[in-house]
Amino acid sequence: MTPDELSVALTACLKAAVEAGELVVPTEAVPAEVRVERPKNRDHGDWATNIALQLAKPAGLNPRAVAEILKSRLEAIEGVAAVDIAGPGFLNITLDAAAAGALAKNIVHAGSQYGENQALTGQVINVEFVSANPTGPLHLAHTRWAAVGDSVARLLKASGATVTSEYYINDAGSQMNNFGASVLAAIKGEPTPEGGYPGAYITELAQQVVRDHPYVTELTDEAALPVVRAAAYLAQLADIKETLNDFGVHFDVFFSEQELHSTGAVEKAVDRLRGQGHVFYQDGAIWLRTTDFTDDKDRVLIRANGEPTYFAADAAYYLSKKDRGFVEKIYLLGADHHGYIGRLKAIAACAGDDPARNIEVLIGQMVSVNGARLSKRAGNIVELRDLLNWLGADALRYSLGRSPADSPLALEPEQLQKASNDNPVFYVQYAHARTKAVDRNAEAAGVDRSAFEASLLTHPTESNLLAQLGAFPSVVAEAAKFREPHRVARHLEVVAGTYHRWYDACRVTPFAGEEITDLNRTRLWLNDATGQVLANGLDLLGVSAPERM
């Protein structure tokens, strides 16, 4: 029996008690779901709930009296061995060994789908992250949201949501002209222009542009600039996509800002916002009255010279997401974009949406890497490509995903490269590799999964391991709900530690000369269930699950 199954049974007991008149409480006081938690002291049972304390006041009863009503119904559930009332009214539930152990077989049968849930079924969500300017290589500032954003999207999908991962390409505006001018200057052997982009990567782009378009060297600057800008942009965007792919980060859509301008979407967005009654004219410019919706100041949409602002493109982009059917739009932004929260929520409100429901802005803090070398190729930055070559995608993805994104993070490369238990990614991956080693040893010894007797899994380390495996779907659901992949990483570390202790205490393969029993076969199921949970969790974090280490 999984914690979720027990939760369903407990919820049914509560509703039955209310329907039978044993508990008289207002309808709104009855929770849709009664959750169970692992007690800190295992002497207090396998699972515990404080539902009796929650319902005592609306029921007008002592918490222990509420607990007594639920206790009698819980004891009748198949698989529940005992129910005890502790303290002011906590319900401590002990499962019989067969009910607890059956989980191992269920996990193996579920395979890669174990941990998936329907908590967000029906939600259509757009997750936008990274969205770095296509004027240079990805660097350290982009790494955290690349890792976290991809994992958030995976978690949302695992919880039943329909999710689109999106990268907004800032390919419009003066920065693109400066970028193109920088590459053109490199082609001509001239210094970087004022406001341009330095670095060896510009020279590399210049060489590639000349290889692909040799005729540009014969054009005037005016004629060459648009050709060079377009070619260099495509080459740099291809480099960004390749780096993201090597980092294990997937995007469904790369959305061009320039397309908003070329298709007239920006002008149409201004007209739509005008129709909502929030546009006004001042000093020859067109403004959006965002202060009506908690923004700190009103924002210019169209300058007095007729040029749209970047904010106008932001508004058009939001409306594009809305028109494409995304009910919830999640933006993952760096700490330097904190001021965007108010203006983005104001856009949503001006568009007739509910900022509390239709838009969510997550702010991440900066990451530093001790000992990281600045890129000579890209100037005064640490390139993501260099970090991948140095630390590897797995170590980088896991270390970025295991800490809350809203806290500053300093990575220690020396620790991430250690093959020891104080390296979290090694610790978890090694646990998975160990489950595969047990599989190989079991096969060599003739132990298979031809029998399964859940009631044999009675060792304390087995009940502990089963409890952690059973908690995995709830951890996934909570991580998706709060957009916090680190919850999965930290749980995997608990699973790994619990598994290692079980491995030390319980043998799957018998000693030489000993008979193979159903206990050996059943423990193989538990071993494989653990490997499946570790693999599924690592996949949610974008990290590989090696079979050998």
UniProtKB/Swiss-Prot annotation:
Chemical reaction(s) catalysed: tRNA(Arg) + L-arginine + ATP = L-arginyl-tRNA(Arg) + AMP + diphosphate
Cysteine disulfide partners in this protein: none
A Gene Ontology biological process term: arginyl-tRNA aminoacylation
InterPro entries with a match to the protein in the record: Arg-tRNA-ligase, Arg-tRNA-synth_N, Arg-tRNA-synth_N_sf, ArgRS_core, DALR_anticod-bd, Rossmann-like_a/b/a_fold, tRNAsynth_Ia_anticodon-bd
Locus of motif 'HIGH' region: 132-142
EC number: 6.1.1.19
Subcellular location as annotated: Cytoplasm
One GO location term (cellular component): cytoplasm
Alphabetical UniProt keywords: Aminoacyl-tRNA synthetase, ATP-binding, Cytoplasm, Ligase, Nucleotide-binding, Protein biosynthesis
CDD domains reported for this sequence: ArgRS_core
GO molecular function: arginine-tRNA ligase activity; ATP binding
Family, similarity comment: Belongs to the class-I aminoacyl-tRNA synthetase family.
Subunit structure: Monomer.
Protein name: Arginine--tRNA ligase
Gene: argS
